[in-house]
Swiss-Prot record:
It comes from Arabidopsis thaliana (Mouse-ear cress). This is RGS1-HXK1-interacting protein 1. Keywords: Developmental protein. The lineage of its organism: Eukaryota, Viridiplantae, Streptophyta, Embryophyta, Tracheophyta. Required for some glucose-regulated gene expression, being a physical connection between RGS1 and HXK1 in sugar signaling. Prevents roots and inflorecences growth. The keyword Translocase does not apply. Interacts with RGS1 and HXK1.
Length: 263
């Protein structure tokens, strides 16, 4: 017996078996793909359903919140509307009571001027700082314990020390500024005096030159000719300029004398 006869499989039946095996494998693969697609579709449908449910719940929540907010706003607005007339009534009541009280007091003051004057004087004394402190010390101040009075006095002493320290610092700064200003003033005064002396010497020199120009002018008047006339014109112009400078210098010297600077 041959091997093919022993196994019961002939050469003609082998291709049929292979074809059947391939078809079974393809069928199983197709079934797996279909199942995978169906699972994916079911998952997508579930996700869409959850999304729709979430959107619906969010929408319902938003609508409930808006409805609650509108109801609360409406109730608050109604409460305010109900409170306004009550508040106006209370305001008018207090206003009438205040003005009636003021009117009664004015009428009483008009009918009893002596009492009104006494009350006014007493009120003014109470409002003033000195009498108020005196009254406090002689009335309510007597009921304070010694420890409380000591603590209050100690606090005042500390405040006074702080004020004194502050004034010391301010006075030290002011003294330093004053010393610097005094030094600058002395230096400026010295420079001003030196400038004044220089101006005074310059004024004397200008006056001397003016006198010499006047003498030269007298001498040129005695010389005939056009050249002498030309020189006289130049000397006259020079003399006028020297006179103007001398007047300006004398004014500056007078101004410095008015400031207390000896020149």
């Amino acid at each position: 017996m041959s091997e093919t006869e022993a196994t019961g499989v002939t050469d003609d039946s082998a291709p049929a078996i292979e074809t059947e095996t391939v078809s079974d494998a393809m069928e199983h693969t197709a079934i797996g793909v279909v199942e995978s697609v169906e699972g994916a579709i079911e998952g997508a449908e579930k996700w869409v359903g959850d999304l729709q449910r979430t959107v619906k719940e969010s929408k319902d929540t938003a609508m409930r919140s808006a409805r609650s907010l509108r109801e609360n706003s409406t109730s608050q607005f109604r409460s305010i509307q109900d409170f306004i007339p009550h508040a106006l009534t209370q305001y008018k009541t207090y206003e009438n009571a205040f003005f009636s009280k003021v009117t009664d007091e004015l009428i009483y003051a008009k009918e009893h001027p002596a009492a009104a004057i006494g009350i006014g004087v007493a009120a003014s004394l109470v409002l003033m700082r000195g009498p108020r402190r005196f009254l406090f010390r002689n009335t309510l101040g007597r009921f304070q314990s010694e420890e409380a009075q000591f603590l209050k006095a100690e606090k005042h002493v500390q405040e006074l020390n702080m004020s004194v320290d502050l004034m010391k610092k301010e006075s030290r700064k002011l003294l330093e500024r004053t010393a610097l200003a005094e030094k600058d003033m002395k230096r400026g005064l010295s420079e001003l005096m030196n400038s004044g002396n220089d101006i005074h010497r310059l004024a004397k020199s200008v006056h001397k030159a003016e006198c010499e120009a006047a003498d030269l002018m007298d001498g040129l008047r005695q010389i005939p000719g056009r050249d002498a006339i030309k020189l006289r014109a130049e000397v006259a112009s020079m003399t006028s300029l020297l006179r103007q400078k001398r007047i300006a210098l004398n004014k500056r010297i007078m101004g410095m004398s008015d400031l207390g600077v000896s020149v």
